[in-house]
């Protein structure tokens, strides 16, 4: 997903 832009939740 590209929704990790507003928050660093893409690392989890």
Swiss-Prot record:
Q: Which keywords label this protein?
A: Disulfide bond, Neurotoxin, Secreted, Toxin
* GO MF annotation, one: toxin activity
- Location relative to the cell: Secreted
Q: What is this protein called?
A: Conotoxin Cltx-1
Domain writeup:
The cysteine framework is C-C.
Cysteines paired by S-S bonds: 4-10
Native organism taxonomy: Eukaryota, Metazoa, Spiralia, Lophotrochozoa, Mollusca
Please classify the protein's predominant subcellular localization into one broad category.
Answer: secreted
Keyword Secreted belongs to the record: yes
Please give the organism. Californiconus californicus (California cone)
What superkingdom heads the lineage? Eukaryota
């Amino acid at each position: 997903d590209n929704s990790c832009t507003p928050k660093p939740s893409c690392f989890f």
